[in-house]
Amino acid sequence: MKQQFFPQRLFMDMKRLIINRLVGLGLLVVGALVSCNAPTAFVPVPSPNPWVDDYTALSSMENYKQWGTYNVHDPACKKIGDTYYMYSTDAIFAENRKEAEEKNVPLGFIQVRKSKDLVHWDFVGWAFPEIPAPAIEWVHSQAEGKGATNIWAPFLMPYQGIYRLYYCVSAFGRNTSYIGMAESDSPEGPWIQKGCVVKTGEGDAMNAIDPSVIEDPETGKWWMHYGSYFGGLYCVELNPETGMTMQPEDHGHLIARRANYRKDNLEAPEIMYQPELGKYYLFTSYDPLMTTYNVRVAYSDSPEGPFVDFYGEDIKDTTNNVPILTAPYRFENHPGWAGTAHCGLID
């Protein structure tokens, strides 16, 4: 199987590189032992960490213009000209909407930032002034009037001078969800709502959240990947001219799932094409959002799959696929970071 060969070859190339480095290191060590009469004890030199991993002083919602990359959730980043634009979920734990209203701070919409160097970020504002009414109506109609309090997981896709901003609205913990799309002639807006791309309810296998769109460079076809632990991740073809599904009410086909969807989380597909290898890499997020959230990757010869992991296993099966690329971490003298997933790919 052709797809099984690539990771093994990559592993062997890395193995040879490590062996060569170790041989070189061994020669250096031998030379050092010959030239020294007695070993010198290593004494570490303490040095302060130049990176301050604490933004407590800026964490209040009224300081949003100073946040930089802090409080960025579910990011999507596109380079347009010489500027990087980043769109993200606006989420605050234990959010206080009364406080937000008193301080005149929008809450629950799509945050927009821009940068020239990926280091210094300017806060542009919020993409929409409100949650689109059709999304609220759909979610409320399927969830007994609950949900639809935030806009999640935006994704930007340029097309012939037009910018399409995909987003989703849902009821947390349910698959009553709505993926919508808005257009603008500027990456900073203003945006015109174009309607629903995919929507799901209690009777559907999938969950219409976390959209990610890619164009096949050979065929020009557009594919949207989306979904979550409700039924897994799906891929559906879009019409490049409209940005909507090629076939009305098409939900696409399954590309990834896990055994126990109530316990084993899976969501947030992000996909990229690597032209030198001719492969599509699908980055996904596994496990619970608040704790062991982690990023994993699979690959395919086609944007619509099938996608396989390092060992060539199709990620539609119920295997606990690897490798894990990022996971929660904690350094010494620091409380640590949890929920380090739903990655964004820099284009």
Per-range role (PLM):
Residues 6-23:
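Bacterial N-terminal signal peptides that target proteins for export
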Residues 36-347:
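Carbohydrate-active catalytic/glycan-binding domains of CAZyme proteins
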